[in-house]
Every structure is written in C-alpha cells, then in structure tokens.
C-alpha cells in the first residue's frame, strides 16, 4: 500500500511540474485532426465574351444587265444629220416624218411618193414632157443626152428614149413604162449597146464592163437616184438592175452630186405627174433608209 502511494505521489508531482491539471491528465482529450488548409483556388477569369459576329454584309445586288440594243433594219443610217425641209418644198413633203430611219422611213416616204403620183401618163405621151425635162438651157430645142452628155436636138432621128430600168425587167409594164422619172433622152446607138444590161462599177466614159454597163462618171449619180426611185415607188428588186445591189447605187449616189439638170427634171415631172424623186431633192434620204456610203445632206 505504501508503495502504491509513493508511486501515485510521484505521478502527481510530475503532472504538477508539467503544468497540466490532474483533470486534464486523467481526461484524455480527443485529438481534433488538423485539416491542411486548402490552397484557395485561383479564381477563374471571367470568360471573355465572344465577339459578336458581325452581320454578314449582304451581297451587292447584281445590276440588271443592260439590254442589247435592238438591231436596226438592214443598213440603217448611222448618221444623225438634222433634216430641215426647204421652204419651197414644205408643202410637198407635209406630213412626212423625217425623224424615222430604215424601213420605217422607207415605208413612209414610199407611201407619200405613191400618193403624190396622181397622174399616170402613157408611154406615148412622154415626148411633150421629156423635151422640157431634158432640155439644154443653153441650146433651145436641144436635150442633154444620158450617158454621153451631148447636146442634141430632142427630135433628131439619132435620139430615142432610154428606160433606165429596162422594160424587160419591169413588173408592171403599163404604169412603170410611162413613169417619167426613169425615162431619159439618149443616143440611139448607145441605148442599143446598153440594152438591158445591169449597171456595174467602172470608171471614165459610159461603156460595157464585163457583163454589165457603166453609165459614166458624169451620170452614175443620176442613174442611182432614178433606180432608187423605182425601188421606192414600185418595190422593184435590186438584182434586176445592179451587179452589186443597193450598195452600188448608194456609192454612186454619194460620189456624184445632184446636177442642175436633175433638179430641172424633178420640177418638170412634178408638174406632169404630181410626184417628185425625193433622192434628187436630198440624196441623204437614201442614206437614212439604206445606210451605205453617206451622201450629202442638202437640207441642213
């Protein structure tokens, strides 16, 4: 017992030296596990909001295709010459729309020319008018002969009447045969040599060229304007009269200007049968219809 007491006393002394109370020593404190403090998570950076997509640029609407320029009628005039009808001809051409071109203008001018042709002469009536139409102003009683340009008595036995558009190639021998606009005083032998040959290109004097007839440098424009009148009035085909169709007539119309004799004929024939050859009044009217070599616009 004494031994136990001594051991207990020693134990208490040790406790006293450690500074702990007897209750603390006797009551075992539960060990509170110490948590290792967690390293605080680095806060996430707020997500950068996505850059909003730019709205797609709408496609530039396609420009409507420029419509193709409608094709003009065959060989329309590319010229834009202004037409000013002379005062002395305004009454005659009243109602004609000179702003038109191509076939539209051809149809209008043809209708006007036909309407004005109110007196139809028989072929047997020609001399009383042609003797005035083809008269040589410098020599009373004489006529200027087609193709040669000679001045000769109109009623001479060596003179007869040339159909510039041959009778054998007319479609209506009656009315067309007596139309003064394509009848000319001519040397009988020259007329016979020409026969019904189509007109063709050449140079110099009137003569045969290959299978055609060249009317001379001096008269090729006269011939072209008479032939174009016959096409306009009667719609006679070009291949009956020219080896190069309307192109040759347009070339001659441009190269050989209207003569004083042609103007004289136009005035006399208007008095006789009512209508005029519009291509003598202004060669440029042919250019407005068929194009080709541009002729002089005498109505500016």
Residue ranges of predicted features:
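Positively charged n-region of N-terminal signal peptides that target proteins for export
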Residues: 1-4
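Short, Φ-rich (hydrophobic/aromatic) sequence segments
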Residues: 12, 102-113, 224-231
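Domain-level detector of nuclease and nuclease-like folds
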Residues: 147-300
């Amino acid at each position: 017992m004494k031994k136990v007491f001594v051991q207990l006393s020693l134990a208490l002394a040790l406790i006293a030296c450690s500074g702990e109370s007897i209750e603390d020593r006797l009551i075992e404190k539960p060990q509170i596990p110490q948590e290792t403090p967690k390293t605080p998570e680095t806060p996430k950076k707020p997500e950068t909001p996505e850059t909003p997509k730019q709205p797609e640029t709408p496609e530039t609407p396609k420009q409507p295709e420029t419509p193709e320029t409608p094709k003009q009628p065959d060989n329309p005039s590319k010229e834009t010459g202004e037409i000013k009808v002379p005062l002395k001809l305004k009454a005659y051409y009243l109602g004609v729309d000179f702003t038109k071109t191509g076939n539209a203008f051809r149809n209008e001018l043809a209708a006007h020319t036909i309407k004005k042709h109110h007196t139809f002469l028989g072929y047997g009536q020609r001399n009383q008018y042609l003797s005035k139409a083809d008269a040589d102003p410098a020599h009373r009683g004489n006529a200027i002969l087609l193709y040669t340009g000679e001045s000769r008595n109109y009623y001479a036995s060596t003179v007869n009447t040339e159909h510039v558009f041959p009778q054998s190639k007319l479609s209506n021998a009656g009315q067309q045969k007596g139309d003064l606009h394509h009848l000319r005083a001519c040397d009988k032998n020259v007329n016979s040599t020409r026969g019904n040959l189509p007109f063709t290109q050449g140079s110099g004097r009137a003569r045969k060229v290959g299978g055609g007839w060249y009317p001379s440098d001096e008269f090729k424009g006269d011939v072209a304007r008479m032939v174009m009148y016959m096409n306009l009035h009667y719609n006679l085909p070009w291949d009956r009269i020219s080896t190069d169709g309307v192109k040759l007539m347009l070339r001659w119309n441009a190269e050989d200007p209207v003569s004083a004799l042609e103007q004289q004929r136009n005035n006399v024939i208007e008095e006789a049968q009512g209508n005029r050859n519009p291509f003598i009044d202004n060669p440029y009217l042919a250019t407005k219809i068929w194009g080709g070599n541009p002729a002089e616009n005498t109505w500016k």
